[in-house]
Amino acid sequence: MTSFKLVKYTPRIKKKKGLRKLARKVPTDRLLKFERVFKAQKRIHMSVFKAQRVLDEIRWRYYEETVMILNLMPYRASYPILKLVYSAAANATHYRDFDKTNLFITKAEVSRSTIMKKFRPRARGRSYSIKKTMCNITIVLNIVKKSK
C-alpha cells in the first residue's frame, strides 16, 4: 500500500522580463532620462488585444528596426501603429532635433477606449447589439547616447 503526502499548493508567479530585455539591448546608463518624445493616438477602431500583439513585438527596439518589423507584419493593426511611430519620430526630429538612428522605443502601451454600440436588425422584429471597440495607443521614444 502506498502512502500519499499532502503538500500545500502554491501557484508560480511569472517574473516580468521587460527590464532584462532593455538591459540586453541598451545599457540603462546610456538612456537619457529626460530626452523623450511622447505620442498618443486616441480612438483607433481596433481591439485592444489585436493592438497589444503588435506592440509587444516593437517594444524595446530601435526606430529603424521597428519600422522594418511593422512593414513586414501581416496584421491589420500594424498600419495605424506604423503611422504613429512615424509621427513620433518626425516630431522628435523636427521639434527636438534628435537623430532617427538614436531613437529607441521605451514604452508602447494600449488602453481601452470608448465602445460604440450599434444594432443589427434580425428576424421577427428583434435586434442584436454589436459592440465596436476602440483603443488608445501611446508610444514613447527615448534618445540613446552614442557609446564613446
Curated annotation (Swiss-Prot):
One of its GO terms (biological process) is translation. Keywords: Chloroplast, Plastid, Ribonucleoprotein, Ribosomal protein, RNA-binding, rRNA-binding. It is found in: Plastid, Chloroplast. Gene3D superfamilies: Ribosomal protein L22/L17. HAMAP family: Ribosomal_uL22_B (MF_01331_B). This protein binds specifically to 23S rRNA. The globular domain of the protein is located near the polypeptide exit tunnel on the outside of the subunit, while an extended beta-hairpin is found that lines the wall of the exit tunnel in the center of the 70S ribosome. Belongs to the universal ribosomal protein uL22 family. This is Large ribosomal subunit protein uL22c. It comes from Sorghum bicolor (Sorghum).
